């Protein structure tokens, strides 16, 4: 059976994403992100499902430091709607709760709701671990923020669904593989391309490196800087663009990037997820 690795405990949102994209695969829980990526690098799993950013809490900082250190490829993206649930032990009421435990990202996404209810926030390793710990300790004054899948797995009650501060909360995942998956350009499809590059720390270096995307009409949808090598110079970048390298405009833009930048590495080109085809991305 094929295997997909994810960070977290069974019932985590990464696990939920795995059940959506790879329902018939074995889902391998890992303690951390590098563990999930290493399973793929070493051939113990075919894929890794890794969260990159959330529409409410922003980017997952650690991932940008890890991606350049692997030799893995991005073969797909997945957008998972986040329905945070406030969980409690069976028979517990909201009035009994004093503290709520969850992953820091989940706490940030439900921050205002908990302030309004006067609940103290406590960080946990991940959302599902907070649910599992709640089930094991049996404290009726403690709640957890996790998925409905976690509630089902650990026998907890759902006191509130959609507990997040902002509706439409969504997490973007990237699917990593040890082998590149070259998908020839199909004019009937829309594509994303993800890549890494570096520039010298001099005036206009980034401007020149990215100029080709503007002159060739290629839309850049994400540009993130990250530190590397123990320096404080943010001259390393992760870039997502609309398009496929087999398209002339994209090919020309990448050629200009390679001229002005260094260490250009295309992580992968993959079909655009249907979430991007909604009105918000048109």
Can you name each region flagged by the protein language model?
Residues 1-282:
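Domain-level signature for soluble enzymes in the chorismate/prephenate branch of the shikimate pathway
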């Amino acid at each position: 059976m094929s295997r997909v690795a994810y960070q977290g405990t069974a019932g985590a949102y990464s696990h939920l994403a795995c059940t959506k994209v790879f329902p018939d695969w074995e889902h391998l829980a890992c303690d951390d992100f590098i563990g999930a990526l290493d399973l793929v690098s070493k051939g113990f799993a075919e894929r890794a499902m890794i969260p990159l950013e959330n529409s409410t809490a922003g980017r997952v900082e650690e991932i940008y430091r890890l991606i350049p250190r692997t030799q893995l490829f991005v073969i797909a993206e997945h957008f998972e709607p986040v329905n945070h649930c406030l969980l409690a032990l069976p028979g517990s009421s909201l009035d009994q709760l004093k503290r709520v435990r969850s992953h820091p990202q989940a706490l940030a996404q439900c921050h205002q709701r908990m302030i309004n209810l006067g609940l103290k926030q406590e960080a946990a390793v991940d959302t599902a671990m907070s649910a599992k710990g709640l089930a094991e300790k049996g404290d009726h004054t403690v709640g957890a923020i996790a998925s409905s899948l976690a509630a089902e797995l650990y026998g907890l009650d759902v006191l509130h669904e959609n507990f997040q501060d902002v509706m439409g909360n969504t997490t973007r995942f990237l699917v990593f593989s040890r082998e590149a998956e070259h998908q020839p350009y199909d004019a009937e499809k829309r594509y994303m391309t993800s890549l890494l590059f570096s520039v010298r720390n001099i005036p206009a270096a980034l401007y020149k490196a990215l100029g080709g995307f503007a002159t060739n009409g290629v839309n850049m949808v994400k540009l993130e800087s990250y530190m590397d090598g123990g320096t404080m110079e943010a001259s390393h970048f992760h870039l997502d663009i609309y398009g496929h390298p087999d398209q002339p405009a994209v090919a020309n833009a990448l050629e200009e990037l390679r001229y002005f930048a260094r260490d250009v590495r295309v992580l992968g080109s993959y079909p655009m997820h249907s979430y991007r085809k909604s009105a918000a991305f048109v």
